[in-house]
Every structure is written in C-alpha cells, then in structure tokens.
Amino acid sequence: MQEIKFKESFLRRYEKLTDIEKFKEISTTYLRRSIRVNTLKIGVEELKKRLETYFSLTNVPWCKEAFYISGERRDIGNLIEHSLGYFYIQEAASLIPPLVLDPNTSDLILDMAAAPGSKTTQLASLMENNGLIIANDIKYDRLKSLYINLQRCGVLNTIISLNDFSKIKGFQFDKILLDAPCSGTGAIRKSLGTLRMWNPNMIRRISRLQKK
C-alpha cells in the first residue's frame, strides 16, 4: 500500500481521541472484502457452496448472512451470482446499523440517505420483503444506483423518494435509518483522497449538518 502522509493538524486532533499509532497502522492495511448473502433470492449455505469454488469464505461474527471473502480472483462484481442479486458487496461495518435497527416485518421505515442501497436491501431482506421502506436520497443522480440495486436484489417492499426530510414535517415512521454524511476518516485505507481533503473547517461543516 502507498505510504500515507498525515497532516499535522489531523494528528493533533486525533491523537487526543484515539490511539493514534494504532489508527495509523490500521489505515495502512488493506480492508478485508466482505459480502452479504441476499436471502430474498438464495439461502446462505447454497451461495456459500457456489462461491467456495473460487473463494475462501469466513463468517463475519456479527452477521450470520455475511462473509469475509478472499482468493486470487478480485472481480467479485463480475460473478453471475452478483448480477443475479444473490449477494451484495458490503463492508462488514456497514452491516451493523440495520441489525441494530432490528426491523419488524410490519414496520414503516425511512432510510433517509439510502443510495446506493446496501442498507436498504439489507433491511428488505431482514423484513422478508414485508412492511414498507421509504428509500430516500437528497441527490437525484444517486437514485439510479439505488434503483438498480433494489431491482437486482428483488426488493419489493420499497418506494424510492427524492426529498430533504430534514425540512419535511408531519410524517411518522416506526424506525428511521440515517447514514449521515461524515468525514470518512475511518476509511482512509480505501481512498487517500479522504485524507487529502481533510481539514478542520470540513469537520465543523459536517458536524453542523449532522446536528441538523
């Protein structure tokens, strides 16, 4: 991995909040790839048998439908099983919010910043395509990827919405999932551009947006 140079202002801020040496170590290691089985279309064991032809699979401890995946092939997204919607390429940490939300099959749920759809499709799977999900995003150009992923994964209980729900009053939901904009500092190893763009003003701006 390319050597990472941290800004002095970055180090001054985060050395107060965490073990900065451990943070730097993790930031220079590759992120383990992981997938979530889409149980709307296939069983966990059936997909596991199919993928073990090409890959080594290890269970993600906190999600029984998910696996860390490794092997010589890197083109997971080109597999026919992916095109058919049998699995979603999803980071292990991203699996946690829908599990914590713990949706019921009769819930009305708002996914407030849904695109590209990893958590929306996971919610639909947990709800067994029952209940109703409003999959919203504030940016029109992000809705295409959301629509494609919902179609690919066979999601039937979801309506796509283009709204700024921070300005809309009077709606009630059983549960709301909000993946709010963040600094992305936990994902530096995926994109060094995150570190290059980082500055204190950006942190303050994002913090104000999250509070809103």
Where are these regions (language model features)?
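S-adenosylmethionine
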Residues: 1-212
